[in-house]
């Protein structure tokens, strides 16, 4: 899966979770999306894991600073 395909799929997941049209970039953070709170974060992580058929470790989840870092982990594990 290419990085472009990862971001396209991530944008779909984000749009579903936050119920709005969202296009994520390397630098997108929780501060950029109004409804991204701790509960939404849990849902988002679960949906991303399902979409990419991967499981993040707790260390990975806590270490993600932006969507680019999430994509790095997906790319490494996909």
Named regions from a protein language model:
Residues 2-36, 40-46, 50-78:
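Phosphopantetheine-dependent thiolation modules in NRPS/PKS and related acyl-activating systems
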